[in-house]
Structure formats: C-alpha cells, structure tokens
Amino acid sequence: GAALAPSSEGDVDLRCQNAKSCPAQLRERVAYLGSRGVLDIEALGYVAAVALTQPLEPQAAPLKSEADLFDLTLEDLLPIQAQVLDPDSGLPKLDADGNPKVVDFFRKKDGSPAEVALKLLRNLEDAKTKPLWRILVALSIRHVGPVAARSLAAHFGSLDRIFAASEAELSEVDGVGAILAQSLREWITVDWHREIIERWRASGVQLETPGHEGPGSGGAADGKFAGLSIVATGSLKQFTREQIEEAIISNGGKAASSVSKKTAFVVAGENAGSKLAKAEELGIEVIDEEEFQRRLNS
C-alpha cells in the first residue's frame, strides 16, 4: 500500500496518500456523501458503500472513485458480493462458524434485483437535483462543511464560479476565510478531482443554482435579511430546518445556531426550548412561522 504521510504541511495526523483509489478512503467518502447531512441517499449507507468500493472481487468494484457514482447501472450492481464490515473497526464481521460474513447485497437469492438496488438508482437520480451546497459538501473537500458550503453556494451560485474564484475572492465570503479558500484552490488543481466534476456534469448532476447569475446574484447582498443573524428553533410546520436555513441564507441572512445579542430575531415553532428562553432573556424579537413567511414574501 501507499506510505502514510501528512496530507499537507502542518497536519498532525497521517493519511494514506493514495487518496483516489485507496479502498478504505473511498469507502468512507462514499458513505459520507450518502449521509443525511450531505446528499441524503437513503440506500447508500455504510454496507452499500462497502459493497460498491470493496467487493469480494476487488477488480469488480463498480466505484473506482466518486466520479463513477452517477453512472451506476443495475448491471453494475447485481453481481456484487461483499464482506460485511464493522463500521467502527473496518474489520470483517464473522458468522457463527468464525468465517467472514459474505452477502449478495444488491440481488435476491433468485438472482432478481433486491429492493435496495432499485432504491439506490432512484435515490441517485433524485440526488442530481439536490441544492448546490450539498453537491459541494459531497466532494469531501477539507474544511468545507455545510455552513461554508451554503455561503459559497449562495454567493457564487455555481460550482464553476466557485472554483474559478481566487483565494482572495473566496476568503471574502462569510464563513469561509483563508484556510478554507486555500483548500478549495488546492483541491481543484488535482486531475482526478476535476474528473469527478466533469463526470457528474455529464451524468446530469445540477452544478448550479437555477436563476443565480453570479457573485451574490443581488439576492444575498441585497436580500430581505441582508446582514441579519437569525435563529430558528422548535418544531416548524411549514419548513424543514434545512428549508428555513436555505431561505435565510439565500436572502442574505446568517442562519445562526445559537442566540446572542447579535441575533436580529428568532423564529420559534412548537416546543421551542432554551433558545426561546435565551431570546426572551436578552429581549430579542421572537416571531412565528407565519410572520417569517410574511417577511420573506414582502
């Protein structure tokens, strides 16, 4: 295998440098991009990630990198046999006789497609139109989590514009900063990283926010909530947590996770707890969903 070394200068932890095709790293990246906070591909859990990247016959792995993900077909999935690995240790689980457990993950005993295979293909088709920030997080770029990805997506509106921006331009985006900007610029210089983007584009993945015309697109910088720090708390009926955060950010606001003196107002749903109490203690304005919707549409 490849030698272990720091990924970049200043790193304390050691990583396998064969990042593209190191099966263990690829497995973890695939499981991560399928997770709820990223592309939310329900059928792409840890066991499916193992089957796709580390099948019993390594040469038969349908995923050699993330670039292959949206090109998967039923024909790719059906032959796969895989060992069942423990998510914590990464070691094979054993059956009653002490032998590694092996499963035909994507097919039934009669050879027909298992529901998980059909569901995975449906999920992947749906994932092609996920919000831009989720696509950005799915690329597993160091330091780029959901908060920074939302800000970048709201400001630039397309993956191409994000990667065409200079470090200085990236650093100016709220929540980004110099380290993250450098990480973005370094990531896009790698050939196989660019291949992921081009293959996903060719497969029909939406790499831009429809109607967004460029930096700020007028929406964020001049939006209804421009410069405001807004907190949502409690159970909301009209919005999921993701939807209300998206509405705040795309209109220039900051979707904050905690209440402080800088908070402009709090949107409170049912069973709002400590954040509501904190807002009342600080004299911060509290509104309900209906009022938030009214301000959004005004």
Where are these regions (language model features)?
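Conserved hydrophobic/aromatic packing and binding residues within compact polymer-binding modules
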Residues: 30, 69, 248
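Conserved ATP-binding/catalytic motifs of P-loop helicase motor domains
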Residues: 24-27, 39-47, 54, 58, ...
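Feature of Fe-S/electron-transfer and energy-metabolism proteins
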Residues: 31, 36, 47, 74-78, ...
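Short acidic (Asp/Glu) and glycine-rich catalytic loops that position anionic groups and cofactors
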Residues: 9-13, 27-31, 46, 163, ...
